[in-house]
Amino acid sequence: MPISLGNAFAKNFLGNAPKWYKSAILLFLVINPIAFYLDPFAAGWLLVVEFIFTLAMALKCYPLQPGGLLAIEAVLIGMTSAEQVKHELVANIEVLLLLVFMVAGIYFMKQLLLYVFTKLLIRIHSKTLLSLAFCLVSAFLSAFLDALTVIAVVISVATGFYAIYHKVSSGKEFGHQHDHTDDHSVHELSRQHLDDFRAFLRSLMMHAAIGTALGGVCTLVGEPQNLIIGEQAGWSFGEFAIRMAPVTIPVFICGLLTCILVEKCRWFGYGAKLPDAVRHIMEDYNRYEEAGRSPQDKAKLIVQAVIAIWLILGLAMHLAAVGLIGLSVIVLATSLTGINDEHSLGKAFQEALPFTALLAVFFSVVAVIIDQQLFRPVIQWVLAAEPDDQLALFYLANGLLSMVSDNVFVGTVYINEVKTALLNNAINREQFDLLAVAINTGTNLPSVATPNGQAAFLFMLTSALAPLLRLSYGRMVWMALPYTLVLGLVGFFSVELLLGPATEWFYQAGWLLPHSGAPAVLPALH
């Protein structure tokens, strides 16, 4: 039966998203201009909550469309300007380049990654040990590489594992073409194993994601905000690591203990083991690959291994912007492994570009936060506190705000405010150094609570793999909860109880030298 034109428009709006979801987005679009007219500050926070809602409902509808509509309206009604949005995008161009080029570069190294991690999967039989290995490897890599790059590697590996089992459970051979997003062809007897395998991969993904936070907070190059805070404070690579150590070492140890505990006790969705049927398929796949590996295939693996070394050295030594190193990986990997047609190149960009567009929308919301000064009351309250209370309050304020906003933005806002206080002689240099540690750890650790706190977590949530593993916003928050509590609380007590005495001991031991005055440069926000 034909439908009316009006119903056709309604049906087309946000596609196959549920009707209640479409109604909610339309309601947001109607309410926001009214709220902005009545109270711009409240309207700004309402927009932040609405954007978080679109992220939470990512499995109902990709957040780009509803979030984009809200962002466009925000610019139109004057909550922010197109110029401010452009400023945010320009300020974060390195992150955007990373997403476009680095994720595509990792795609062309899939064979090597699958080779290495398949060996790891079939040789380590203990799930707890395997989880610990994923967490440790992610932490080590994230201390020197960007967390987004590490998560891109983990997603590539998990997708490869999932595709192998899905293909076999659908009655196909290893060499056959197969669509691993379609469950209709999965044999009934294999469905339970598939669900168990999803739970297994979900837990590994989350352990790896938390690992990026554990490692990323430790070094100057681990996270973008680390670099901003380190530059503002005038710290070298070594000094940064030493100053963070009173907080990062206890947090790292407790994070690894949490990994072991949730796996052993099977809490919060962890503890799922690799089904024997899946292990046998992985072992068969490994033997199939080994038997069929030609000299040309071996040459490709060697080339990819050499490129991986270049990738790690290039990023760890900051030889170029991350995105440009990613572009060099694309050029080297394709030219030296025989990929020379546009169609094959195009596939590599499919995963990253939707998220790149979503991140641009996210920066539009950050522009609203800046223009409407949504964080100013919290910042003023913390700076007005007594010096003895400031460390704990800065840690808490940064942590809470980083759960709802980009932690790079939060860290940048706070370090600039503290730097201004130092230049105005409101605080001394010793207090500034301690506050910088509290800000850095506050933005990095509690932000694991939600996917919008860290770009790497958001990338994982909105990746093509998330719906395959049934990894929703709510499930990510639930699985991150034990880590949020442990990392957040251990970080808080370390800042409150250990940071001051340990830093004093570092001075006395000669590991640190006191700074005199403020560093010369105070860069603009972002």
Swiss-Prot record:
Gene Ontology CC terms: plasma membrane
Disulphide connectivity of cysteines: none
InterPro entries to which the protein is assigned, alphabetical: Na+/H+_antiporter_NhaB
Domain of life of the native organism: Bacteria
Any one Pfam family match given in the protein's UniProt record, by short name: NhaB
PANTHER family: NA(+)_H(+) ANTIPORTER NHAB, TRANSPORTER ARSB-RELATED
Protein name: Na(+)/H(+) antiporter NhaB
Organism: Aeromonas salmonicida (strain A449)
Gene: nhaB
